[in-house]
Every structure is written in structure tokens, then in C-alpha cells.
């Protein structure tokens, strides 16, 4: 087998973040992965981050839309709140469909179909923690879940681990 590279490699090639003010203000996005273990329970995530918004770590923007002076970040969420209509104009043309954070959560937890669907929905919280704005009209943000079904586990604990893994995978995708 080969080694896994995070950042602008593989499915992360060509990914950018912070496109909300236009592609000229964007930075490189990428692909990231993270896994957690609690006893025999394992929960991991792999995420390709091609977000319209900014990526945050511990509440601080680490990648996203550059400001006009190229000295820092413009804060995409604040910009959207102040300029929502203009944002729609930017994405009315060729950039529609070019924004998504998409990932997969993989676990060995024994979950049924309904619990696995809920796991995917709860894992989506990791996107909301790490990307702002997230799940906007021009995003295709989504998380899927796969469960091996070998370790009995509390579905809520698995969901919390999954959201953390998605959040950290997004952070790693831009570092």
C-alpha cells in the first residue's frame, strides 16, 4: 500500500477555500483525515474541503478568503451577513456547483441502518464547527457513514467522536 497525503493531494487536488468574495481571494483547500479510538471502538473521517467559507481551528480562521490588502482574512461569515445579495451575484455564473465539503465517517461500531443515517447527520456537525459559513445555498456539504458493525457502542458517543473527527480532518486538510 501507499501512504496517505493530506492537503492538496489526491481528491484534495484543486480544492480551494474562502471563495465567497470571489476566486481571486481564495486559498488552497485539500483532503484531511482523522481517527479516534475509545477502547475497542474506532471512528475515523476523511474529508475533502472545497469550501465556499473559511476554515477555523479553535474559533480562529486558519484558511479562507483573504482580505483586500492580502494581510489576513476577510471573515467570510461576516462578509456574507453584510453582503448577502452580492454573494449571490458572484455565484450566479460559472462558480455554481464548485463548493463542497464532502466526507465519509468510518467506524467499527455496531449500528443499524437508522443509527448509521443519524451518525452521518451528527457527523455533519464537524463541518459546522470547522467551516463558516457552512451548509449554504451554494455548498454541497455532505457526510456519509459506513459501519463495520463489530463493536457494541452508544450511538451518541459514536456521533460525538465522528463530529470531532470530521472537524479535525477539515483542519488538517488545509494545513
Regions found by a protein language model. Name each.
Residues 1-175:
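A structural signal for small-residue-enriched, beta-sheet-centric alpha/beta enzyme cores
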